[in-house]
Amino acid sequence: EEDITVENEITNEKFPISLKAYGDGPLQLSTDKNFQMYPLLEGVGGLITDKEQIAKIFENEAFSCFSEINVLPLIYDEKKQRCNILVFDAERARNETAYIRKETEGAGRKHPAYRFFDKNDCYICEVRYGNATANALQRGLWTNTKNATPFFDSVTNGWVDYSHNLVLVKLFSHALVSSAKGHETALEEIKSDIARLKQANGINA
């Protein structure tokens, strides 16, 4: 995991981004370190279906982190040897949440969680319990790259196969934390390599 600061060259606005490497599956979007999200949901009820009530939940200060998600994860699938850089579409998740349901059982669950679903019963994300007895994996705002695929945008335009080249994963991970100057230098090297490959194979540039 790496925390960096990105600056908009047009507006000069700076904002933090948390770069993370995760396996394909559960992905933490926010730690909810002040433990505000779960108590808010618990105060509303076990099944929340009213649209106005759901809108008020998202507008509540406890859910401010939902509109400030700054996680850029490199997702890897070791079995299929492929990787993907995904961005969670928080605005779409918010707009398409049809109901929120408290779940206390299943999949070896030790603590309850509130799960968010769309109108087709598709999983979007969840708020985990997270009190003093819970560890870092049992609290905060989470989603799942397998179960919530429609709510992600792929920076790499889909999965990238690295079965033939493990260096590719290192290239992605290093590129995420390097500067624009570093990107330019690397790009020139890659362009030169492509030119060499074309020449070796008799392909016109």
Model-based region annotation:
Residues E1-E2, E7-N12, A21-A205:
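Nucleic-acid endonuclease domains
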Residues P16-S18:
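Elongated alpha-helical scaffolds
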